[in-house]
Amino acid sequence: MAQRDIETVIDNVVGNKVIPASTRQDIIERTDGIPLFVEEMTKAVLEAGSEGAAQQRTIASFPSTALAVPASLQASLMARLDRLGAAKELAQVGAAIGREFSHALLSAVVSEPERTLASMLDRLIAAGLLFQQGVPPHSSYLFKHALVQDAAYGTLLREPRRALHARVAETLDVQFPEIAENQPELLAHHCTEAGLIEKAARLWGRAGQRSLERSALVEAVAQFTRALHQITSLPASPELRRDEIKFQIALIAPLIHVKGYGAPECKAAMDRARLLIQKAEALGEPPEDPMLLFQVLYGFCVASYVAFDGDMLGEFAVQFLGLAEKQRAPVPLMIGDRVMGAYLTGTGNLKQGQAHYDRAIALYEPS
């Protein structure tokens, strides 16, 4: 904003009060013309100046130390939060829940009497930190800006923060099962921040599957990746190894759609999936779904075909068809013959390739 616009914002916040010209100039210089910064800085200056003041005293009469402009927006917001008393703790709870939260969830997490809760919410709203929509207990609240939420959240120490996220996670799980079911990523986030890693991993995997079903492919990649990251931080167990294989293979399809078959990330994901299956088999823990390895090998086949890498396509086609013949599974046999046919015809072996295509057609069942 231009200086004239900045001064207009300051005037709107100050109202009929007066601040020294030097303080006004400090605000103008430190806020870089950012509207939120201007507004929050001015409010912080007014609140600092009005503490302990008699009603008739003007802001202009305060010494410069009382009207010191905070050095940053973060400092300004934190100073305003510190002056809210008990309402600051409510802001911290809200910040841990998210940028927007319902009255019902907030009330369940804080377990305060409704009158006390209403009083603290009124203070936050009056301070311009929260917006309210609707009437309690059916209302919802929104932090004025993400920076306000960040400032409130940033005042939490590590252990209280973890405990708060654990409380939110438990509340969602027990009292709001519909949210936990329909928004597993929300519950996963709180479990992650609470240090409930194993539970978080499975929830991120569930969230990834839901995103995949909705064709939200970028979100699915991020969520499956988070699930896998959580698992690798835990001590190994047969159950976690099964989950890791499942999530690693589930990651491949959305990753291919987002990055393309030839992307190194896709090859790395398929390599990792195949390695995990091989390790599980070596431990006597083969995947419960025998089709999982076929999914990985088929991904390699298509990636090789798209990259015009005949040698690699041939190698994976042989592996795929060999495994299908070993298991005598009709669908993998059909796909294996089709892949082998593509390899052979692509390398000039038309007669042999046609034989595999004929076998694939014979195995095909439209139903």
Enumerate the language-model features and the residues they cover.
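Short secondary-structure boundary elements
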Residues: 4-222, 226-234, 276
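Inter-helical turn/loop elements of alpha-helical hairpins
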Residues: 113-114, 131-132, 151-363
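Phosphate/pyrophosphate-binding betaalpha-module
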Residues: 367
